[in-house]
Each structure stands twice: as structure tokens, then as C-alpha cells.
Design a protein with these regions (language model features):
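The feature encodes the CheY-like receiver
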Residues: 73, 82, 103
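Residue-level signal for the "D+5" position in two-component response regulator receiver
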Residues: 37, 72-75
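Conserved acidic carboxylate
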Residues: 13
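Hydrophobic/aromatic residues positioned on beta-strands within the core alpha/beta folds
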Residues: 96-99
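Short amphipathic alpha-helix used as the core "switch/output" element in two-component signaling
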Residues: 53-57, 78-91
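Short hydrophobic/Thr-rich beta-strand motif most characteristic of the beta2 strand and flanking loop
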Residues: 32-39, 46-48
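Active-site residues of response regulator receiver
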Residues: 69
Length: 104
């Protein structure tokens, strides 16, 4: 199964173990879309807005879904979400917010 004609999913997760767990969950659910992993908030926005290392994707379609961690380096998940919602081109992309926390 794929979402929206095999469009890309953007996973924004800095913890490699959590990213691996999320990718495995997609795989076990037979979601076969290509998945791009961004390791921090700035990398996620660079991917979405075709900046920096991702400037070569300016003409490529946006992801069909964003899975976003809240606790990220460089720019937290809420900052990423605000930037996504502030732009006409990205404001309607569905965003699923996930986070894990170890409280003692």
C-alpha cells in the first residue's frame, strides 16, 4: 500500500533508534512510500523549501505526509510546524507529531 501515488513521506527525527522504529512501523504496515529522514528542524525545513543541501529538489513535489518529533536540535518541532503552516505552499501538508520522553 502507498499513500497518494507513492509520494514521499518526511520523517523528522533526531534519535536514530526512534527513526528506525518509525521506519519499521511503516514497513510492517505495508506503507511503501519513499521516506526521507531529516535529523533536525533546520534540515527538515531545508528539505521542504529546497534550501542548502536540498536546493537541487526545487522542482520536486512536496511530501504527502510529515511525521515530526517535537524535541529536535537546531529548531524544535513546534518551530518547524510554525514555519510549515506559515507558507502557502506547505500549510496544507498533514503533519503527525510524535515524541518520546523519559521522565524520571
Amino acid at each position: 500500500m502507498t499513500l497518494a501515488d507513492n509520494k514521499t513521506i518526511l520523517l523528522v527525527e533526531d534519535n536514530p533508534d526512534d527513526a528506525k522504529l518509525t521506519l519499521r512501523a511503516f514497513q510492517r504496515s505495508n506503507i511503501l512510500n519513499p521516506i526521507v529522514v531529516a535529523r533536525d528542524g533546520i534540515e527538515a525545513l531545508d528539505f521542504l523549501f529546497a534550501r542548502g543541501a536540498h536546493s537541487d529538489r526545487a522542482d520536486m513535489p512536496l511530501p504527502t505526509l510529515i511525521v515530526l518529533d517535537l524535541k529536535l536540535p537546531k529548531l524544535d518541532g513546534m518551530g518547524v510546524l510554525r514555519a510549515i503552516r506559515a507558507e502557502e505552499r506547505t500549510k496544507l501538508i498533514p503533519v503527525v507529531i510524535l515524541t518520546s520522553s523519559k521522565e524520571e
